[in-house]
């Protein structure tokens, strides 16, 4: 697939990874993560903080912060990053809209926050990991983490963990310790999974 006069070439396999990963994320967020009662690290968690502290709408602050992260990503990672991210973001929204038409598969998870946090992290970690592996970012958090890695040459799990820990620590200003602990488990596990999926080696077929 050729895009623009610069002839940016998109890999069909990477497009497929972005679409599959985003769909997995949407499935997990709708059927599991939304039932866990946990907060978030990263940009989503920061929008909740700003809403609590300054009464600013997450719709506004989320848009501004995500746009800023994607702008940084574009500057450091190029147009192919933006195109793969657009595919990932569109697929996520479309998939979530489809899943919303059906009842949640495991409503009982609402009474098992620890289990929901772990299972939800699996969906988020694997889904986002596939997108990042393909070179796209389904959210501003992913764009920021990928940009930091490009500059520092560090493992992608480090910026995920750092931003999540910072936001969760600040969230103690309005959330109880138990909820923060469950949230910490979710973001740490999902961040580690993203790094694992991104770096996993796929065996080459012989022949």
Kindly give the residue locations of the regions a language model identified.
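Core subunits and conserved enzymes of cellular information-processing
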Residues: 3-207
């Amino acid at each position: 697939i050729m895009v623009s006069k610069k002839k940016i070439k998109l890999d069909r396999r990477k497009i497929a990874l972005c679409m599959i990963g985003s769909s997995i994320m949407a499935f997990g967020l709708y059927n599991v993560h939304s039932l866990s009662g946990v907060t978030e690290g990263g940009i989503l968690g920061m929008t909740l903080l700003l809403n609590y502290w300054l009464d600013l709408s997450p719709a506004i602050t989320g848009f501004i912060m995500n746009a800023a992260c994607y702008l940084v990503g574009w500057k450091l990672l190029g147009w192919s990053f933006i195109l793969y991210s657009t595919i990932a973001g569109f697929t996520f929204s479309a998939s979530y809209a489809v899943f919303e038409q059906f009842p949640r598969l495991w409503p009982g998870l609402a009474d098992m926050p620890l289990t929901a946090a772990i299972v939800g992290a699996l969906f988020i970690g694997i889904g986002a990991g596939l997108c990042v592996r393909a070179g796209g970012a389904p959210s501003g958090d992913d764009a920021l983490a990928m940009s930091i890695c490009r500059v520092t040459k560090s493992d992608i799990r480090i910026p995920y963990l750092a931003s999540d820990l910072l936001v969760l620590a600040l969230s103690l200003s309005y959330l109880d310790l138990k909820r923060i602990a469950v949230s910490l488990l979710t973001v740490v596990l999902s961040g580690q999974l993203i790094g694992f999926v991104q770096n996993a080696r796929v065996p080459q077929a012989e022949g």
